[in-house]
Structure formats: structure tokens, C-alpha cells
Amino acid sequence: MSDTLLNPYFGEFGGMYVPEILVPVLKQLEETFVAAQNDPLFQAEFTDLLKNYAGRPTALTLCRNLTKGSKTKLYLKREDLLHGGAHKTNQVLGQALLAKRMGKTRIIAETGAGQHGVATALACAMLDLPCVIYMGAKDVERQSPNVFRMRLMGAEVIPVQKGSCSLKDACCEAMRDWAANYETTHYLIGTAAGPHPFPTMVREFQKMIGEETKRQILEKENRLPDAVIAAVGGGSNAIGMFAGFIEEKSVQLIGVEPAGKGIETGEHGAPLKHGTTGIYFGMKSPIMQTKDGQIEESYSISAGLDFPSVGPQHAYLNSIGRAEYVSITNQEALDAFQALAQHEGIIPALESSHALAYALKLIAQNPDKEQLLVVNLSGRGDKDIFTVDKILNGGN
């Protein structure tokens, strides 16, 4: 792996564990990415799209009511206001521009909650690229508004009927497609995971979240936050937020994994704290797996967090103690979802609700503590209203 331009590892995690046929493709992607990072014309086009198409910078909003009775100031980084409804749009625009630069004529992607699929579909529509989205059949059912959006923008959505019919199966199908069609096709991975250079590339295309937050909080409060908190599935919204603060040792980085129905039930999606290191999805990282090395089913009420592994940089930050990783149950996330809607008039995605729930837990544990917290509100909850309605009104 010494002949890559960038270090493919974060400590022991990461790497490029793919069929030999894909190694030259990944190296071409890395070369194109490195060249683009140093090309003022590429950067200008990317910045222009972020500003005039996606709507950056996004707001940093102070919660006026949620923290009443405490001494905490809680801010939300409003990635829900981005075009497409979530942080996914940031890095999709970057990767789609790279695909055009490489001369690729077709885009494929996997999606869980559908947000990455929507972001990919909108970028492909705007850049005139055909796209195919792989989505677990279970997720197609629970995220129907996003499926309609993708199809409306011209994407072909393929429901994956294999395995658990969820995100991990969609990832496998997309990888198979890519191995068969790599000459014409770019696989636009939706998170900061997968084989090198994806974890590094996605972080770089998401790091404006943390950079903007840092500027905005200094402007508003004249100091850095005590902690930044973000939900972790594959980990792209969290690494985008953390990237702006990793060097600021006074700022605690808190990643929130889904505890699902409770860690003790086994029905969760928390591989960082409750998995073991292995090889999956082209990388070495913590995975939920059996003693025989079979991938276990992950579970979360939130389709976007329902993933049995995690990005390698998160694994590294956890291993060196720079970031802390915790977990939140479905019920806690649902409570936070409702609390934000009722007290602040903002409907968060169920993914982001996990991060918010942990912030609310911190506040409740010590209401007299003066603290400044920032939650990355990675997406809006329009896509989740039917799921939540079903649960609150007597569904599962």
C-alpha cells in the first residue's frame, strides 16, 4: 500500500481491501482527488455549487426553549437546511465533479435513509449524469418519500431483496455493479467508510461543516464549544463536524451510535463500542460480526444509522481516546425528535435525533453546569414522519 499518494490508514484502521481488478480504479480516483484538491478551478466550481446550489453556509441556531431550567447553551448546526435536506449533498457534489473529471458516464450509489440517494440523484440531474441507486427493500418501504424524490429526479432505484434487505446489502450490490462496470462507472459511496481513498475524500468534502461551525460559534460566543456532538452510522456527518475541532484539545468530540432496542438485546448498530475489528466493505474497521466472522444484522429505527460497521477514522479517534463514542436507544431518539419539534419548531431526522438525545441527556444530568454544546443536525425529518407516526399511533 506504500504506492498510494495519501496514507490509506488511520492507525491500524482503513486500507484498500478490494478485488485486484478495482485497485487501479481506486488509485485513479485518489490521483484525481489529489489533483483536484490542488486545482483552483476545481475548488472554485465546488465552492460555487456549495454556495449557489446547495445553500452554504448553513445556519448555527441557538435553542431557545429546550434548555430552559439549565445553564447550558445548545446550538444546532443546521445541515437540515441544505438543498436535498441533509449533509449528504456536500460531498456528493464533490464526488460527482470528480467523476466528470475522470470521464465517467454513469454513477451508482447505495442508500439507507434515502438521503444519500436523493443527494446523488439531484447532483446527477444537475450535472447530466445517469444514476442507479441501490437500496435495501426494507428501506424502500420505510423511506417512500425519498424513493419518490429520487425517481422524480431521474434516478433508477433498485430495491435489494437479499440478506436483511437493508443498507449493508445495498452496499454489497453496489460493489458488485462497480466491479463489473468500473470503466464507465463511478461508485459514489455515501459515507466516510469503504476502501481508501473514500474515508479521506469524504471527510475533505464534508469538513466545511466543522470549519463553518468553528467560525460561527466564535462569532456568537467568542469561544469554542465544550463539546460537539454528532450521530455516527458510517460517520460522514460526524467526521465533517469533528474535522474542524480535532486539533482543539479543549473541545470534546462525541459520536453517538444507535443502541436500537438496547445494546443488551443485540438489536443495535453500535460496532465501535460493541463490535470487533475485521474486514468489511473494503476496509479494516470495527464490525458487528459473529465469532465465525459472519456479518451480524445491525438495527436502528433510523435507516441511515442501520450499518454494521463504521468509518476507520472514527475507529482511530476512539482507539486514541480523542473522541468519545456513546449510544442512544430508539426510544431516546424518538423523545428527542418530538422535543425539538414541539419546543423549537424544527423536525430533525431520526439520525440527528440520536445526537440531540445525548445532548439532552448531558443537560439533564447536570442542569447547573455552565456549558456550550453544539449538535450537528445532519438532516431534516420529513422523510421520517410516516415512521414516527406509525410508532406513536400504535405501529411497531
Curated annotation (Swiss-Prot):
Alphabetical list of InterPro entries matching this protein: Trp_synth_b_CS, Trp_synth_beta, Trp_synth_beta/beta-like, TrpB-like_PALP, TrpB-like_PALP_sf
Residue intervals passing through the bilayer: none
Lineage: Bacteria, Pseudomonadati, Pseudomonadota, Gammaproteobacteria, Pasteurellales
Metabolic or biological pathway: Amino-acid biosynthesis; L-tryptophan biosynthesis; L-tryptophan from chorismate: step 5/5
Cofactors required: pyridoxal 5'-phosphate
MF-aspect GO terms: tryptophan synthase activity
Name listed for the protein in its UniProt record: Tryptophan synthase beta chain
Gene that encodes the chain: trpB
Keywords associated with the record: Amino-acid biosynthesis, Aromatic amino acid biosynthesis, Lyase, Pyridoxal phosphate, Tryptophan biosynthesis
Entry EC number(s): 4.2.1.20
Its biological purpose: The beta subunit is responsible for the synthesis of L-tryptophan from indole and L-serine.
Source organism per UniProt: Actinobacillus pleuropneumoniae serotype 3 (strain JL03)
Subunit composition and interactions: Tetramer of two alpha and two beta chains.
Similarity-based family: Belongs to the TrpB family.
Sites bearing N6-(pyridoxal phosphate)lysine, chain numbering: K88
PANTHER family cross-referenced by the UniProt entry: TRYPTOPHAN SYNTHASE (PTHR48077:SF3), TRYPTOPHAN SYNTHASE-RELATED (PTHR48077)
Enzyme class, spelled out: lyase
Reaction(s) catalysed (UniProt annotation): (1S,2R)-1-C-(indol-3-yl)glycerol 3-phosphate + L-serine = D-glyceraldehyde 3-phosphate + L-tryptophan + H2O
Lyase recorded as keyword: yes
GO cellular component entries: cytoplasm
PROSITE patterns referenced in this protein's UniProt entry, alphabetically: TRP_SYNTHASE_BETA (PS00168)
